[in-house]
């Protein structure tokens, strides 16, 4: 019998750019009754206390059990058909056992790699095997999940949100003059990303960096542009000479949220060469430009910056067609989840 999910409870971050927010808007677009519990409540405490719990208790949120109790209470009041937990969210093993006993179906969309040292948390790994199903956007997790004792899991990639990821309303001549000569990167200064950008700067590549913590690196601070709002990000992506699409290697990602988001917005993408990206974008120069490592990237950047506008437009049109025409919205991901759960 096909399960028709009409009531969805999301456990996630409702702030803009986060997966929890994207799933919330996707469920609303499908006409579902949906609520979201903000995981940030589990971490609200003085900085010293957060650090104490983080370092001495294995990345444990200060209010793990209290937040978990709020999940149980909300489920009993809202009575969702499905509970969707996003990533390494503060839902304890104890809470999952209670929810299962009460008959609630709880799944996890594993936004981060729990075997990445930066995210490793024993309390979460204890809970992970108790989910009814785990969806992961990285193939590298599949064998880990088997070894960990997770019985039911599926690969499900990231997506884009049509409400947020679309071409800018207008790209002005000032935008082009400001950004067309730059290689743009939008995202935080993770160590892997810093290493790549540092090599570009050493090679004399003109870069523009938007996101957190870039100013913390003295040799990159001059290229840091701070944070940009959603519309400005769309204009940057559409106007930049090229946009870097990097995976998080420490996370063993084959693609990232940006892989879908930037493609939906449109622009010239320099994409890390992975199997996931090849499956999404096709061969080199069909819709994106691939690079294999930092040395290869410098050469590909010169290729991208030297392209005629007509060439860039062909790549962009092909890229947007592959992503937008391929059922890659977060609403489509929700529908795919239901098909898998009903199989």
Where do the model's predicted regions map?
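Nucleotide-sugar donor-binding catalytic core of glycosyltransferases
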Residues: 2-56, 63-73, 78, 86-94, ...
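Short, amphipathic alpha-helical "lid/cap" segments that border enzyme active or binding sites
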Residues: 68, 72, 294, 298, ...
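Acidic, glycine-centered active-site loop in nucleotide-sugar glycosyltransferases
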Residues: 279-288, 292, 300
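Conserved acidic donor-binding segment of nucleotide-sugar-dependent glycosyltransferases
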Residues: 288-295, 303-309
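A charged, aromatic-enriched C-terminal amphipathic alpha-helix characteristic of glycosyltransferases
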Residues: 306-339
